[in-house]
């Protein structure tokens, strides 16, 4: 009798194990078959990297910056195409304004040397700490004007941030197009992928 109960118990356990395994496989299949958005797919591909921190050295057109971001230490190469900006208003600054000890955010190419520290072409160097009062560099991948014409929605080339820009942020918002480079000021972002925000101010560079 005891042997019969043991056999029955083992059979029941095996049945439950099989059923649980089948349910797990079914759930995995359902997850795998869910569509993956384009924004999520491109999270691993960064068109623009950034580091926020302090200038350690200035060597001709190369700024050595230590801080936080995609790289803790980076040598940013300033070219004729690099935007040198005041983070408070988006106005252009001279390279001489970027001195050792200044707080900056540098936006740079993912194409980097293998040296230590790595070197990369700087797209923009923004003077000021990385607070809400300091604008963020934004390369426009897509721009879509609302049907009622009251705002434009832009997504950056990293496809990590979608921003809504209206006439309060920029009076010529309707003229913003793909390929433009912007400075954006905003308070908060959603936790979605991509993140979303409403711009308080937008400057076309």
Which residues does each predicted region cover?
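A short macromolecule-binding patch
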Residues: 71-81, 159-167
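Low-complexity "stalk/linker" and mucin-like segments enriched in Ser/Thr/Pro/Ala/Gly
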Residues: 83-86
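Short, flexible, surface-exposed loop segments at domain boundaries
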Residues: 2-9, 20-70, 88-157, 168-205
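Hydrophobic h-region of N-terminal signal peptides that target proteins for export
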Residues: 14-20
């Amino acid at each position: 009798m005891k042997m019969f109960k043991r056999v029955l118990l083992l059979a029941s356990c095996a049945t439950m194990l099989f059923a649980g395994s089948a349910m797990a496989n079914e759930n995995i299949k359902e997850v795998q078959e869910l569509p993956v958005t384009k924004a999520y797919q491109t999270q691993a591909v960064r068109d623009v990297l950034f580091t926020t921190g302090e200038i350690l050295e200035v060597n001709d057109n190369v700024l050595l910056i230590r801080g936080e971001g995609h790289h803790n230490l980076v040598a940013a190469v300033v070219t004729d195409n690099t935007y040198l900006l005041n983070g408070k208003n988006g106005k252009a600054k001279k390279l001489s304004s970027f001195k050792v000890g200044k707080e900056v955010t540098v936006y740079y190419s993912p194409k980097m040397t293998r040296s230590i520290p790595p070197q990369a072409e700087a797209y923009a160097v923004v003077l000021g700490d990385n607070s809400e009062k300091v604008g963020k560099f934004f390369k426009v991948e897509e721009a879509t004007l609302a049907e009622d014409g009251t705002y434009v929605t832009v997504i950056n080339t990293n496809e990590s941030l979608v921003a809504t820009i209206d006439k309060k942020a920029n009076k010529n918002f309707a003229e913003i197009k793909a390929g433009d480079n912007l400075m954006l000021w905003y308070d908060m972002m959603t936790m979605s992928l991509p993140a979303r925000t409403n711009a308080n101010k937008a400057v076309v560079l």
